[in-house]
């Protein structure tokens, strides 16, 4: 399955509050931070809303497991 590599290239100073929340939802905190996310329509929609703040590319790597998968693995 494909994944999306997202990088925050601009700071959040001066941007609207909803865009800050979206960037936080993508898991990006500081400028130049990078995150590997699953290739879903929801992720692409979030990226589209803050496209002026981020750079992204599709990569051939497995996205990190979700929260439920990590919890199940920790219990085993």
Curated annotation (Swiss-Prot):
One GO-annotated biological process of the protein = translation
For this protein, the parts annotated as crossing the membrane are: none
Instruction: Name the GO cellular-component terms.
Output: large ribosomal subunit
Q: Which UniProt keywords apply?
A: Ribonucleoprotein, Ribosomal protein
Q: Which organism is it from?
A: Anaeromyxobacter dehalogenans (strain 2CP-C)
Q: Which Pfam families match?
A: Ribosomal_L30
Q: What is this protein called?
A: Large ribosomal subunit protein uL30
Q: Which family does it belong to?
A: Belongs to the universal ribosomal protein uL30 family.
Signal sequence bounds: none
InterPro entries, sorted: Ribo_uL30_ferredoxin-like_sf, Ribosomal_uL30_bac-type, Ribosomal_uL30_ferredoxin-like
Tell me what gene encodes this. Answer: rpmD
Gene Ontology MF annotations: structural constituent of ribosome
Does this entry carry the keyword Ribonucleoprotein?
Answer: yes
Note the subunit structure.
Answer: Part of the 50S ribosomal subunit.
